[in-house]
Amino acid sequence: MIIGIGSDLIDIRRIENSLQRFGERFVNRCFTDIEIAKSEGRKNRAASYAKRFAAKEACSKALGTGLAQGVFWKDMGVVNLPGGKPTMQLTGGAAARLQEMLPVGHRAAIHLTITDDFPLAQAFVIIEALPVAPAEGTV
Protein backbone atom coordinates (compact mmCIF):
# COMPACT_ATOMS: atom_id res chain seq x y z
CA MET A 1 0.00 0.00 0.00
CA ILE A 2 1.15 3.54 -0.71
CA ILE A 3 1.80 5.49 2.48
CA GLY A 4 3.46 8.60 1.05
CA ILE A 5 3.74 10.56 -2.19
CA GLY A 6 5.85 13.64 -2.84
CA SER A 7 6.99 15.67 -5.82
CA ASP A 8 9.20 18.66 -6.43
CA LEU A 9 10.15 20.87 -9.36
CA ILE A 10 13.18 23.15 -9.15
CA ASP A 11 14.90 25.65 -11.43
CA ILE A 12 18.45 24.39 -12.05
CA ARG A 13 19.66 28.01 -12.20
CA ARG A 14 18.74 28.35 -8.52
CA ILE A 15 21.16 25.54 -7.69
CA GLU A 16 23.80 27.05 -10.02
CA ASN A 17 23.51 30.31 -8.08
CA SER A 18 23.81 28.52 -4.73
CA LEU A 19 26.88 26.62 -5.95
CA GLN A 20 28.52 29.87 -7.11
CA ARG A 21 27.55 31.89 -4.06
CA PHE A 22 28.05 29.36 -1.25
CA GLY A 23 30.22 26.63 -2.83
CA GLU A 24 31.26 23.83 -0.50
CA ARG A 25 29.23 25.22 2.38
CA PHE A 26 26.00 24.66 0.39
CA VAL A 27 27.10 21.26 -0.91
CA ASN A 28 28.22 19.96 2.49
CA ARG A 29 25.07 21.22 4.20
CA CYS A 30 22.61 19.58 1.81
CA PHE A 31 24.22 16.53 0.21
CA THR A 32 25.67 13.21 1.34
CA ASP A 33 29.19 12.10 0.44
CA ILE A 34 27.76 9.67 -2.14
CA GLU A 35 25.71 12.44 -3.77
CA ILE A 36 28.69 14.79 -3.83
CA ALA A 37 30.93 12.17 -5.47
CA LYS A 38 28.26 11.40 -8.07
CA SER A 39 27.48 15.05 -8.86
CA GLU A 40 31.07 16.29 -8.94
CA GLY A 41 31.85 13.61 -11.52
CA ARG A 42 29.12 14.84 -13.88
CA LYS A 43 29.59 17.20 -16.82
CA ASN A 44 26.60 19.29 -15.71
CA ARG A 45 27.02 19.18 -11.95
CA ALA A 46 24.35 21.83 -11.27
CA ALA A 47 21.68 19.67 -12.95
CA SER A 48 22.89 16.63 -11.00
CA TYR A 49 22.71 18.50 -7.70
CA ALA A 50 19.32 19.98 -8.66
CA LYS A 51 17.83 16.52 -9.27
CA ARG A 52 19.10 15.34 -5.90
CA PHE A 53 17.81 18.49 -4.20
CA ALA A 54 14.38 17.93 -5.77
CA ALA A 55 14.48 14.28 -4.65
CA LYS A 56 15.10 15.36 -1.04
CA GLU A 57 12.21 17.84 -1.18
CA ALA A 58 9.92 15.20 -2.70
CA CYS A 59 10.97 12.63 -0.10
CA SER A 60 10.37 15.03 2.79
CA LYS A 61 6.87 15.64 1.42
CA ALA A 62 6.25 11.89 1.09
CA LEU A 63 7.30 11.55 4.74
CA GLY A 64 4.65 14.13 5.59
CA THR A 65 7.03 16.42 7.44
CA GLY A 66 8.81 18.57 4.92
CA LEU A 67 12.18 19.64 6.24
CA ALA A 68 10.96 19.86 9.83
CA GLN A 69 10.19 17.64 12.81
CA GLY A 70 13.74 16.29 12.94
CA VAL A 71 14.10 15.60 9.20
CA PHE A 72 17.22 17.23 7.76
CA TRP A 73 18.76 17.51 4.27
CA LYS A 74 21.50 14.96 4.86
CA ASP A 75 19.07 12.44 6.40
CA MET A 76 17.94 11.71 2.83
CA GLY A 77 20.33 10.68 0.09
CA VAL A 78 19.91 9.55 -3.50
CA VAL A 79 21.67 6.24 -4.12
CA ASN A 80 21.59 3.87 -7.06
CA LEU A 81 20.64 0.21 -6.88
CA PRO A 82 23.01 -2.27 -8.61
CA GLY A 83 21.09 -1.95 -11.91
CA GLY A 84 21.36 1.86 -11.76
CA LYS A 85 17.80 2.62 -10.62
CA PRO A 86 17.77 5.55 -8.17
CA THR A 87 16.23 5.27 -4.73
CA MET A 88 16.47 7.11 -1.42
CA GLN A 89 18.58 6.03 1.54
CA LEU A 90 17.24 7.44 4.81
CA THR A 91 19.09 7.97 8.08
CA GLY A 92 18.52 9.93 11.28
CA GLY A 93 15.20 11.74 11.62
CA ALA A 94 14.03 10.73 8.14
CA ALA A 95 14.54 7.03 8.92
CA ALA A 96 12.78 7.46 12.27
CA ARG A 97 9.81 9.16 10.60
CA LEU A 98 9.59 6.38 8.02
CA GLN A 99 9.45 3.78 10.80
CA GLU A 100 6.62 5.72 12.47
CA MET A 101 4.64 5.61 9.21
CA LEU A 102 4.99 1.87 8.64
CA PRO A 103 2.16 -0.41 9.74
CA VAL A 104 3.22 -3.35 11.92
CA GLY A 105 4.44 -6.28 9.84
CA HIS A 106 5.48 -4.13 6.88
CA ARG A 107 8.74 -2.90 5.37
CA ALA A 108 9.28 0.19 3.25
CA ALA A 109 10.08 0.43 -0.44
CA ILE A 110 10.97 3.90 -1.69
CA HIS A 111 10.41 4.53 -5.39
CA LEU A 112 12.15 7.54 -6.95
CA THR A 113 12.23 9.03 -10.39
CA ILE A 114 14.35 12.07 -11.23
CA THR A 115 14.74 13.97 -14.47
CA ASP A 116 15.94 17.28 -15.84
CA ASP A 117 15.36 19.39 -18.92
CA PHE A 118 17.09 22.74 -18.52
CA PRO A 119 16.13 24.91 -16.78
CA LEU A 120 14.07 22.47 -14.68
CA ALA A 121 14.74 19.38 -12.58
CA GLN A 122 11.96 17.23 -11.18
CA ALA A 123 11.55 14.35 -8.74
CA PHE A 124 8.73 12.09 -7.62
CA VAL A 125 8.86 9.84 -4.55
CA ILE A 126 6.41 7.11 -3.62
CA ILE A 127 6.78 5.33 -0.29
CA GLU A 128 5.19 1.90 -0.28
CA ALA A 129 4.55 -0.36 2.72
CA LEU A 130 5.06 -4.01 1.76
CA PRO A 131 4.00 -6.92 3.98
CA VAL A 132 6.86 -8.86 5.51
CA ALA A 133 6.55 -12.58 4.80
CA PRO A 134 6.20 -14.60 8.01
CA ALA A 135 9.23 -16.72 8.89
CA GLU A 136 9.01 -20.40 7.97
CA GLY A 137 7.54 -22.58 10.66
CA THR A 138 5.50 -19.78 12.28
CA VAL A 139 1.77 -19.56 12.28
UniProtKB/Swiss-Prot annotation:
It is an enzyme of class 2 (transferase). GO terms for cellular component: cytoplasm. It is found in: Cytoplasm. Its EC number is 2.7.8.7. InterPro entries: 4-PPantetheinyl_Trfase_dom, 4-PPantetheinyl_Trfase_dom_sf, ACPS, Ppantetheine-prot_Trfase_dom. Mg(2+) binds at residues 8, 57. Keywords: Cytoplasm, Fatty acid biosynthesis, Fatty acid metabolism, Lipid biosynthesis, Lipid metabolism, Magnesium, Metal-binding, Transferase. Its cofactor is Mg(2+). GO terms for molecular function: holo-[acyl-carrier-protein] synthase activity; magnesium ion binding. One of its GO terms (biological process) is fatty acid biosynthetic process. SUPFAM superfamilies: 4'-phosphopantetheinyl transferase (SSF56214). It catalyses: apo-[ACP] + CoA = holo-[ACP] + adenosine 3',5'-bisphosphate + H(+). Pfam families: ACPS (PF01648). Belongs to the P-Pant transferase superfamily. AcpS family. Transfers the 4'-phosphopantetheine moiety from coenzyme A to a Ser of acyl-carrier-protein. This is Holo-[acyl-carrier-protein] synthase. The lineage of its organism: Bacteria, Pseudomonadati, Pseudomonadota, Alphaproteobacteria, Hyphomicrobiales.
